[in-house]
């Protein structure tokens, strides 16, 4: 009986530790995504003067920033991240036609910061998905699946991103 109690406690603690790792990995993504959202207003202001025909894209970015602040779930944040990446791709593609903009030092610095942030997001997303996969596996394998069911541990969603990141076009 004592051995069974010790085994249950050990499995429970293992599941709690795995859940904490998932939460930590998510907060790392959240920090990087927030950093990107913080960079975007300066970036938009820099390009606005050059790109007068992209007002819809700028409005979309503003809407996404507002939605981001009110979103909690991983799936919703992943969807917003994909939309933002697409908007950034549009801006970066259009910027190719503006040599004066590309020569602007502020634009170059912000593009570099965005590229670095995109790299960090990519690495954080990979780490999060690896951590979630390990956690979800623990929830499925015997005998920890019994403990997970008793103590109501829930599986977590992966952070699904589109195949091409905004990073692919941020190469000024």
Descriptions of predicted regions:
Residues 1-170:
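A helix-centric hydrophobic-segment signal that preferentially recognizes long
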């Amino acid at each position: 009986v004592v051995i069974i109690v010790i085994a249950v406690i050990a499995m429970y603690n293992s599941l709690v530790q795995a859940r904490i790792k998932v939460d930590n990995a998510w907060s790392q993504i959240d920090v990087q995504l927030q950093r990107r959202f913080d960079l975007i207003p300066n970036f938009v202001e820099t390009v606005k003067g050059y790109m007068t025909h992209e007002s819809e894209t700028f409005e979309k970015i503003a809407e996404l920033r507002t939605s981001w602040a009110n979103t909690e779930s991983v799936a919703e944040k992943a969807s917003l991240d994909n939309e933002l990446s697409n908007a950034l791709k549009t801006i970066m593609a259009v910027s190719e036609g503006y040599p004066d903009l590309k020569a602007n030092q502020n634009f170059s610095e912000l593009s570099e910061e965005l590229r670095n942030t995109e790299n960090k997001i990519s690495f954080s997303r990979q780490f999060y998905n690896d951590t979630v996969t390990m956690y979800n596996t623990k929830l499925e394998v015997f005998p920890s699946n019994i403990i997970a069911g008793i103590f109501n541990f829930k599986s977590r969603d992966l952070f699904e991103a589109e195949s091409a990141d905004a990073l692919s076009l941020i190469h000024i």
